[in-house]
Amino acid sequence: MGVVSISSSAARSPLGLGNDLLTHRSSLKKPSIVAFKADDSSNSALIIPPREQVLIPAEKHNEKKREVTRRKPCKTPKKPLSLEHNSAPSCSLGVDYNEAAARLESIYKLSPATTTLVEDDVEDGGSKAKVSRRRKRKESGEEKKVVVRNNVKKEKRMSLDKRIALKRNVQEKPVVASVDKKVTKRQQEEEKIERLVRDYSASNDIVSLDWKKMKIPPVLSSTEHAWLFKLMQPMKALLEVKDVLQKSLGREPREAEIAGEINMTAGEVKKKIEIGRAARNKLIKHNLRLVLFVMNKYFHEFTNGPKFQDLCQAGMRGLITAIDRFEPKRKFRLSTYGLFWIRHAIIRSMTTSNFTRVPFGLESVRVEIYKAKTELWFEMGRPPTEDEVVERLKITPERYREVLRAAKPVLSLNSKHSVTQEEFINGITDVDGVGANNSRQPALLRLALDDVLDSLKPKESLVIRQRYGLDGKGDRTLGEIAGNLNISREMVRKHEVKALMKLKHQARVDYLRQYIV
């Protein structure tokens, strides 16, 4: 399709074409004729200006011009428009240029419509090309097979050399790991032994233990017991060798002599003995509960007495004997084996420490009598008689009385009462030394007694007067006194105990003694 236009200005070009496509520019200031021809094919044709003049209103021309400006710029055709001078009509000097210019101007004004057609054709061609491309893509996509791949990739098989090297490494690693484990176990055991020697190397101070207030360490596990007794075995062997050498030499052997006897160095002998003593001290310290258990079970009557500390010390000696003589190979428990030796040591201490020597057999029978009395009391709900105890133990009555007579506690006259804290010797009165001449009149004694009672608190004085009949109305029970004073019986008993303790004060006793002696 071709376009022909005539322009009177040099800068104006038809259809927005550049100056390089202008076919002819006249040097005169007259309109020039330019001819365009796109192609010689059948689809292209030369536009010939019509002979009739077409008038187009200015408004329509402006609207069409705006449409052209709003639309996208026209794409250039694939083949550039060629200019042919031969196809252009020849012009002569006899042509009316004004008329030709007017006609061409009217044709030019119609040119935007033609351009829009061209642009629409180009755009339609582009859209068709895009549609064809999409169809080709779809057809090509349909031909391809859809393959779903797994995200987990399979490992490739290694080469033969790599497999052989890997197998060698796997075989060598367990050997190295076992060696490392042995080294770490040895190091841990050595550190544990060093800690044991550092903490328990000092011997236990048996005498200074306070069995009522001290905190006993927790009981050890069976594995810990076995490990400690294992550490004690070399020390026991060395001590046996030491005893043999001491008997043969007649003196205490040195460490070098003991080491030469068993083919060891003096340092090794010293280290073995230190480790064994530390293990022994730890076993003693962590099994002190056995001593208290035996005291509470078999010697309950001595737990609150003055002999409690002494008996606990004796039980501790029995525990040490049990630890020294214990044999782990027999698979017995230390608690079962140690109970016998602890009880035996306590009973032996009780028989040897008494002021009057009591045979060991009598002391063991006394323990059995006490146990039988306790069992019968729980069974019958009352204190058992002598015949019932004898029948339970199957002993003669004479043996029973002999044991009780020998088991009576022997107290010193200078020992103090548990409640009043007064010596027993102060309660003994020399009746033979009191004569009639040294006696005082009852009135003076009564006044002195009133003075002493008045020095007490009012309630304490009333309780003593009513309790012992000093008010002239006879002795009264705790219930009667409680009713008179409007207090409980327990409070009456407390007032009585406090008053008696105050009356036994040395100053009050001396004041009353001068009226008695």
Curated annotation (Swiss-Prot):
Composition bias of kind Basic residues appears in 67-78
Name one cellular component (GO) term. Answer: mitochondrion
Q: What induces it?
A: Induced by blue light illumination (470 nm), especially after dark adaptation. Induction is mediated through both cryptochrome 1 and cryptochrome 2 at lower light intensities and mainly through cryptochrome 1 at higher light intensities.
Q: Which Gene3D superfamilies match?
A: RNA Polymerase Primary Sigma Factor, Winged helix-like DNA-binding domain superfamily/Winged helix DNA-binding domain
Q: Can you provide one Gene Ontology molecular function annotated for this UniProt record? A: sigma factor activity
User: Transit peptide extent?
Assistant: 1-34
> Where, by residue number, is the motif Polymerase core binding?
310-323
Name residues in a coiled coil.
Answer: none
Recorded phenotype for the gene knockout or disruption: Lethal. In heterozygous plants, aborted embryos and unfertilized ovules. Defects in female gametophyte development at the one-nucleate stage and white shriveled ovule. Loss of transcription activation of psbD in chloroplasts in response to light.
- Where are the residues of the annotated region Disordered? 62-85, 119-144
Result when mutating R493H: No effect on psbD promoter recognition
Cite the SUPFAM superfamilies for this sequence.
Answer: Sigma2 domain of RNA polymerase sigma factors (SSF88946), Sigma3 and sigma4 domains of RNA polymerase sigma factors (SSF88659)
* NCBIfam families to which the protein is assigned, alphabetical: sigma70-ECF
Q: Which family does it belong to?
A: Belongs to the sigma-70 factor family.
Q: Main role?
A: Essential protein. Sigma factors are initiation factors that promote the attachment of plastid-encoded RNA polymerase (PEP) to specific initiation sites (e.g. psbA and psbD) and are then released. Essential for blue light-mediated transcription of psbD, which encodes the photosystem II reaction center protein D2. Plays a role in reproduction. Required during female gametophyte development.
Per its record, how is this protein called by name?
A: RNA polymerase sigma factor sigE, chloroplastic/mitochondrial
Name of the gene: SIGE
